[in-house]
Amino acid sequence: MQGTLSVWLAKRGLIHRSLGFDYQGIETLQIKPEDWHSIAVILYVYGYNYLRSQCAYDVAPGGLLASVYHLTRIEYGVNPAEEVCIKVFTHRSNPRIPSVFWVWKSTDFQERESYDMLGITYDSHPRLKRILMPESWIGWPLRKDYIAPNFYEIQDAY
């Protein structure tokens, strides 16, 4: 079942895949990494002017990585606001997704956190570097295949 945004994108020949609706009835779409930046600009012009959140997750050990964007269309006098969830999947061997920092500035720290925890490179992001872990940290802590380094635990000292 397609939602109104999916139908609107299809009429304009914009390639995407409808993933249905979540438990709150919010439409979820899958966009290919190579199409994401242009579709993001179109969505912004269409009225999705607020990026509520961006996150990323590891789909499965050895599998794909996903970057998830929750967008809201806020218009004066329109209640409730329209929402959409966009998922962009990428291969873990070379995880690259175009940054949408220049479309929604609020994604700055969120894309940096996704880079820091999962190693997804957001192309054209102006300050893509670690934000939570030290620069010297090796690996991507939230990947399912991540092997945690052995640390000396305080409780072992007693």
UniProtKB/Swiss-Prot annotation:
- Which molecular function GO terms apply here? NADH dehydrogenase (ubiquinone) activity; quinone binding
Class of enzymatic activity (EC top level):
translocase
Q: Which key words are in the record?
A: Chloroplast, Membrane, NAD, NADP, Plastid, Plastoquinone, Quinone, Thylakoid, Translocase, Transport
Write out the annotated subcellular location: Plastid, Chloroplast thylakoid membrane
Q: How does it assemble?
A: NDH is composed of at least 16 different subunits, 5 of which are encoded in the nucleus.
Q: What is its EC number?
A: 7.1.1.-
Which named protein is this?
NAD(P)H-quinone oxidoreductase subunit J, chloroplastic
Q: What does this protein do?
A: NDH shuttles electrons from NAD(P)H:plastoquinone, via FMN and iron-sulfur (Fe-S) centers, to quinones in the photosynthetic chain and possibly in a chloroplast respiratory chain. The immediate electron acceptor for the enzyme in this species is believed to be plastoquinone. Couples the redox reaction to proton translocation, and thus conserves the redox energy in a proton gradient.
Record-linked NCBIfam families: PRK12494.1
* InterPro entries registered for this protein in UniProt: NADH_DH_suC, NADH_quin_OxRdtase_su_C/D-like, NADH_UbQ_OxRdtase_30kDa_su, NADH_UbQ_OxRdtase_CS
Q: Which GO terms describe its cellular component?
A: chloroplast thylakoid membrane
The record lists the organism as: Capsella bursa-pastoris
Q: Does the keyword DNA-binding apply?
A: no
Name the Gene Ontology biological process terms.
Answer: photosynthesis, light reaction
Which SUPFAM superfamilies does the record cross-reference, listed alphabetically? Nqo5-like
Give one Pfam family: Complex1_30kDa
Q: How does it sit in the membrane?
A: Peripheral membrane protein
Q: What chemistry does it catalyse, as a reaction equation?
A: a plastoquinone + NADH + (n+1) H(+)(in) = a plastoquinol + NAD(+) + n H(+)(out); a plastoquinone + NADPH + (n+1) H(+)(in) = a plastoquinol + NADP(+) + n H(+)(out)
In the record, the note on similarity to other proteins reads: Belongs to the complex I 30 kDa subunit family.
Q: Does the keyword DNA repair apply?
A: no
